[in-house]
Every structure is written in structure tokens, then in C-alpha cells.
Amino acid sequence: MSDKAAELLASALKNSRSFAGREGARRLLFSIGGLGIDVVLIVRGQKKPVRESARRTPGCASVRNMTARIEDYGFISDLRTGALISRQGSIDWLCLPRFDSDSVFGALVGTTDHGRWLLAPAHENKQVSGRMQVERRYLPSTFIMETRWRTATGEVLVTEFMPIGGSGTVMIRRVQGLHGHVVMRQELVLRFSYGKVVPWVHRIHDDDGEALLAIAGPQAVMLRADPLPEAGPDYSHVGEFTVEAGQTLDLQLHAFSSHDMPPPAIDIDRALQTTATYWRSWSSNYLRQGNYDREVERSLLVLRALTHERTGGIVAALTTSLPEHFGGERNWDYRYCWLRDAALTLEAMMTHGFHQEALQWRNWLLRAIAGDPHDIQIMYGVSGERELPERVLAHLPGYEGSAPVRVGNGAFRQYQGDVVGEVMVALAKLRNRGVHEDHFSWTLQRNMLLFVENNIKRKDHGIWEMRGEQRDFTHSRVMMWAAMDRGVQAVQEHGLDGPLERWAELRDGLRAEILEQGFSREINSFTQTYGSSEVDASLLVLPQVGFLAYDDERILGTVSRLERDLLDGSGLLMRYRTESCLDGLEPGEHPFLACSFWLAEQYARTGRVSEARRLMDRLIGCGNDLGLFSEEYDTTGNRMAGNYPQAFSHLALIRAADALNRCRQ
């Protein structure tokens, strides 16, 4: 807050008058001259949130527990953070100022009292009824979402986006009347710190007109709209307005630091054009292949939209704690940067013509892992933060009652033996495409190989981050082999320096060990862990990294076993059987979309093309109307499960589409 604003506020507080309020609260009524502010300070206990006068608007009771199905959410991004907007017109998830920050709208994992911003035709906010039609789409090759509402009285188009490249995050919602007239309703419930903090909300006047300003400690947001919503029940702001044919009404929500002056209104026409141009220019680099171009392009756009533009870090998903099993405890925070996901993204970007983005991700990877080679983590914060302590938000009931809601991720402390292999495989592909190593990048890769060498006998938690005891996971051992193999290739084929003989010896030793202990002749399959009879969908990665050919008899035997043990009744693939594999959690989850895409890729690469296409088309049908995918799919309820949108699923889709397109060639 500026010195002038602070001075005015202090003066107002000094001259305020207090009176008793309901529920034993003590209220202070004051005005701030010159700023057009008239507020009530409500003091309860130790916390002193300041709120605008709670005018009650008849008929505007707050609607609670309206969380939509996961697939009903659209996603928009400004490359700093992102928002989820339900088909019912409610923004139920937005974290500020970046992907892994606290939420301002947190109804997704709570109730409407934990923050949301509804904008929809009046009387239709509980559910989309038969009296109204709703259609939505992205403008081609962008993350600008259009929702067309047809009601009994008229038709409106709502355009929603987050401008790219400004100094701070802005959420734009434009309402255009197309036919007749439509009464629109908005309900703004601002709740900072994952729904725990009710901000100080007041009206201000500036050169751009009237606005609502909300402040909570270091954060502030401001709504510019005409008309502004009025103070409603439970410290919400609600209102209705009518849009006639040919009329356009704009709403813009700005996020900024509370110690800064409120930002001016933006030119929405210009912002819309600039944002559309950005996304279309970016996606124009995509090298089209034929089949599944629309799905691959959207998947690449999702990967870009989950990327923090300044740091280059890509988050695994926009959300935390969307359940893998509804009502269960498998709820994790995915708003961080996994080395595995970043490495796979680097591969996908390079394969499809996004060379600059691939280099950006390489640089993020190298910065994140710089330092002690004995201390490489599996995941980092958006800027490379190492400490991501996990805690439970007990005040949030969770998505459809799926508790606990977690922030942070305790897996950052886990040892997962596969991660260095993922990174080394991706960086080797960059080398093979002509990207030269510098002294810094190759030194760090040598350090990574030293990390593998130092941990070569160590058991791990595996790719699925199991919270049970550490074991010898076959996939992890294969990825350690892949790391050493790419080191050997770098010396032999690219002339880089390194202890060739030692790396080759370690590589060959790992291969012999895996073939002896990771393959069961009894079931004719590789196994999840050494000495077990359980299988795991991660075994489909073995041919992807060149450990064996896709059509090797041992791989084909493994595929047969996976089909027998892990395919569900709808033909989608589970990661593993949670009932029999001890992962430290209660059993129960749904088919994993990335693994199912891996199976489609395996089919395509071994001549089972018709089966690959059937599975691919089945999987495409698990996405929503906007082309977005979650982590898992509940085939019984025909609905998405897990965090969303999920980078890993989109990455696997790209690989499967590439394999099928190679079959056409």
C-alpha cells in the first residue's frame, strides 16, 4: 500500500466509531475521504479481517457444494498460473500469483465458501438444466475459451482468457449478447490462503471508474465491471445484469501485490488479439503429421500452458488433491516440477518442432539439479525450490469429500532410481538432433551419472512414488541402465569426455542383472520388482528406451501378462493392482491414462495397428470436449479422476499418436 493510502487509512481508523454487532463481534465504521471507501471492520477473536458492509440482497443466498465433474472444467493459463472454469460458469480453482501458490478460488476441493467466481445466466447456476443449452470451445490453437449459452429468452457468448505477457495476472470475462436478452448472475467469493482468509473488500474510484478492491496481507485483487456486484451474504458479492443483443459487457479481475497501487484497466480488445496471436504463433511451430493432429496440438498447448514462462518449469498438473479414488486418501499435490515430466516434455517439444522450448526446459533441468550430485531430487518447485513439505488442509473437505487435501508433496524426499535415466535419455535426444553440449551441461550430466553409480545397489520407491518399503523396481533398474547407456553413447558417438570403460561395465552389469532378476520365466514376463510375480504398466517403457526391441519375445510376453492382469473390463490399463501390491495406501484406483496410451504405442510398434487405433480412439473419448485429460479414468462412472489437466497423460498421448502416424508412413 502506498504511503498516501496508508496515511488515509490510519486517519480513518483514528476517527472511526465502534458499535456492537451480532455474534458478539465488535464493529468499526469508518470512511476514507478521497478514495470513495466506506467499510466496516469486523473484529472476531484474534483475526481482524476488514470487509465491505454486508448488504443482504434478497434471493441471493450462497450456493454451496456445487463442484462439477472434473471433465466439466475448462482450463486457461497466462504461463504464470491457471484457472479452472466449470461448464456451469464458475471459476472454482485459481492460485495466485503462480501455479503452486495458495488458492484464491478453492471451491474445487472445498465448498463455494472457499472461493469461486460464478458468471452464468440467472437461475441456472445449480446445474445445467434441459431449458438451456451450453456449448463451449477454445478458439482454434489458443487457450481462449468461448461458452455459448442459449436460454428461453436469448443467447449470450462468454469469452474467457488470461492475457499473456502483462505485469500481473488478469482474468478476463467478456459477455456478448447475441439474440434476445439474457439475465446474467455473478457471485464473487474471494477467499485467500486456501479458503481460510476473508479479505478486506471495499469499493474504490479511479480514472477508470468504480472497482472492488480486496486485500489480504501481501496479496490483492481488484474487480472492474459495470455493474459491480453488491455485498451479499457470507461476505460474498452478488448481482444480476441484463445483456441485450449487440451489447458487450466486460469483467476484469486483476491480481497484484497489496503494497503496489491498483493497476489500471486494460484494453480488452487489444489483450484478446495479443493473446490469440501469441498462442497461434506458438502453435504454428507444430509439424503436422495427419491423424490425431488436433489432439496432439492441444496436448502440446497444454504442456506449454502448464509451463511457467519466466523459469521454464512445467508443473505436472494445475491442481492438488483431485482424487485417484473418489472418497479415498490417494490425493496428491501435482503443482510442482518432476524431472521425469520435464524430461519427457523436452522430448515431445523437440520431436514436434519446438526447439526453443526444448532448450528452455533443458536449462531449467540443469539449473534445478545443479549442485551436489549426491542430492538430486525427483521434483522441485516452479523456480527450482528444493523444500516442498507436505501438509494437510484439514479445513477443506476435499473434492466430493475425498480427504485429505494436501499441499506440498512428501515425495520430494523419496529416492526414485529412474529419474536420472529419464533426464539422460531426453538430453541424448537433444544431442542426436544437433544441440551441442556446453561445459556446464555436460559436467552436470557427468554428475548425474556419478549419482547413479553411487546409488547403483540402492532400492527405491519406484516411478509411482509408492509410500511403502523400498524395493528393486525393474523399471527403475532399467532406467539406471539407460542413464549409463546414454553416457557411453555420448563418449563413443559425440566425443565427450568420460570414464567410458567404467560406465560400459556398469551398464552391462545392470543389463545382466535385470534379465536375470527382473524377468520371470514362470510367467514369461518382466515383473514389477525383483523376485515377485506382480506386473506393472511401467514395464511398457523398457522398449521405449531401447533396453529390448518392441517385438522381443520377452517384451511380447510381458504385454500378454499386462493384458491378462491389468486390463479392466473396458480395455483400459491399470498401473498395478493396488490390492496385491503393497504401496502403503488403502487399495483402489482407476485405469491410468498414460499407461493405456503406452499400450496403444506398443500395439502400433508391433504391427497390431487396428488394435492400437481402437484403443487410441477409446482413450481420446476419455478426454473432454476441450481435448483435456486427467490422470485416470473411472470406467464405471464414465468420468475423469485424478489431478487435471495432467501433463503425463498428454505426453503419452503424443507418443502414441506419433507411433500410429509412423504406421501410416
Q: Which role does the model predict for each range below?
A:
Residues M1-S18, R22, R26-R27, S31:
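Low-acidity, Ser/Thr- and Arg-rich intrinsically disordered low-complexity segments
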Residues K4-A5, L13, I37-D38, I42, ...:
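Residue-level detector of transmembrane insertion/anchoring sites
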Residues L8, R26-L29, D38-L41, P49-V50, ...:
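Intrinsically disordered, low-complexity segments enriched in serine/threonine/proline/glycine
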Residues A20, G24, G33, L41, ...:
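Acidic, mature catalytic/reactive cores of soluble proteins
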